[in-house]
């Protein structure tokens, strides 16, 4: 919401998918009610959104692309690198919902073309109620605050920071990254047993 409302002058097109988490669906629907035009991509039979679908939907006036990395219900892993490649020469803001991906796929795989990525602690055994909005290094991505009343968090969100939750998030993130390879092997073994 904050990025679209800040940057939306003259560019009113958004691309997302019909199977996003409600944390993305509802804000995009709100932007649609505000007058933004939304192209809703439908998944294939395996629950994936392809880079070709994104390329077909992309327009000159596309302001924002918001797609998930790992689906919260199906577990499908989308081609974030493919999306980034499609968007290489486009000015659209690229947001990745990475909440389900953290601790399950290597974060080194986050392409530099990603402008924003959202994470939440409880998806990798951290505390509830704390998350991170990663802002990439590309210039020009600005966010207007949705809440007002203080200058905390660089003026984007008011209120005293919950240090205990931030430390809990950071500790859980470190543990998740340390255990990533081992957990992936274990889950792969379990998947093979299930298929047998």
Question: What positions do the PLM features span?
Answer:
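Pyridoxal 5′-phosphate
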Residues: 1-196
């Amino acid at each position: 919401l904050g990025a679209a409302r800040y940057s939306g002058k003259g560019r009113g097109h958004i691309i997302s998918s019909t199977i996003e988490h409600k944390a993305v669906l509802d804000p995009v629907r709100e932007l649609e009610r505000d007058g933004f035009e939304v192209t809703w991509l439908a998944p294939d039979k395996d629950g994936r959104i392809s880079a070709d679908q994104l390329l077909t939907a992309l327009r000159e006036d596309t302001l924002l692309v918001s797609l998930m990395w790992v689906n919260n219900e199906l577990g499908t892993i989308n081609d974030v690198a493919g999306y980034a490649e499609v968007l290489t020469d486009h000015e659209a803001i690229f947001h990745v919902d990475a909440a389900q991906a953290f601790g399950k796929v290597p974060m080194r795989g986050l392409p530099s073309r990603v402008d924003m990525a959202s994470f939440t602690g409880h998806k990798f055994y951290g505390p509830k109620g704390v998350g991170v909005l990663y802002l990439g290094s590309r210039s020009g991505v600005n966010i207007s605050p949705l809440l007002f009343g203080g200058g905390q968090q660089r003026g984007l969100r008011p209120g005293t920071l919950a240090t205990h939750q931030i430390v809990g998030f950071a500790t859980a993130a470190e543990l998740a990254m340390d255990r990533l390879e081992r957990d992936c092997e274990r889950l792969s073994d379990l998947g093979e047993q299930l298929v047998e």
